[in-house]
Amino acid sequence: MSTNRRRFLQQLGGLAAGFGVVSTGLAACGGNEPSSDTTKADSVSTPAATAAGKLFFEISLAQWSLHKPLWEKKLDNLDFPLVAKRDYGISVVEYVNQFFKDKAKDEKYLAELLKRCNDNGVKNHLIMCDGEGSLGSPNDKERLQAVENHYKWVDAAKYLGCVTIRVNAHGEGSREDVQKAAIDGLGRLGEYGAKAGINVIVENHGGYTSDGAWLAAVMKGVNKPNVGTLPDFGNFCIKRDGKGMFDGKCVEEYDRYKGTQELMPYAKGVSAKAYDFDAQGNCIETDYNKMLKIVKDAGFTGYIGIEFEGDKLSPEEGIKKTKALLERVGAIV
């Protein structure tokens, strides 16, 4: 995770933003039925061909891969679908609410975004939601406010034709207290999401959530067909030596392969995190052969989202290298 994103999450982690219902009158690209099979991807995902040489999954593009040009105003959120399709040949996108955080209830804006999606033949898959409070807070008032803060993103996802929102399950307290609170918070949000046909999924994203066994236990506790996980290949740092969840060097890291394996039974999406590559085009920090085998063995046939986050390569080059790696390894595992 980049410094900018860490700062953003710290600044917005406790904000209460209220909620409201967005009209769904405009036809959306993509369906909205929540998944009823927690061992697979979203029920509306179109499985990729599994014949020899073909991928067992489909590739999507996580908007965070382009966070640098987005923060620098070199790229506008409304142009993301076009860029994904034109520059990278990717027809499925994953948004980050940070790049249109004040537009969740702006129907005119959402309509324009959806129009650009449809004009370019791009499908909206999910919205990653940060800065809307702690769904795992042991404080009842804080947790319930966080649940309500996410309602508007469920509504926006419905409008845009997404099937999923990605949330965080952070909270301050003991492992047991935060786990109990997260089960309650996610369960409540999951109920709201189910009414709209939207899945609610949690990423391993720092703190207790980067402990695969802990997050898997939360999923078992929630026990709802539309509440699941978004395993991220690289976000398994549980503790850092700086202040806050995302500052400083990682001093306690969960095994990424073990964690991914534990989270895959509940996965409704996967994030292919990459930072750097060797001369052969392999990801340096993650063995993609090993990781994609774990994903495949879990029976997953949905979307694997490219999330390049490195500093040595440009976002454009990093996205292309991650895509090439997924295509090469995905065809042979």
What residue spans do the PLM features occupy?
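Secretory targeting signals
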Residues: 1-3, 7
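N-terminal export signals
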Residues: 7-28
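C-terminal segment of N-terminal export signals and the immediately downstream linker at the start
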Residues: 25-64
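Acidic/histidine-rich catalytic cores of soluble enzymes
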Residues: 54-56, 92-93, 187-293
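Short, acidic/polar
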Residues: 71-86, 144-155, 252-260
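Aromatic/hydrophobic pocket-lining residues that form the small-molecule binding cavity
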Residues: 77, 110, 146-150, 179-182, ...
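Structural motif corresponding to the early beta-alpha repeats
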Residues: 86-187, 194-199, 225, 235-243, ...
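C-terminal helical cap(s) of enzyme catalytic domains, especially alpha/beta-barrels
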Residues: 316-331
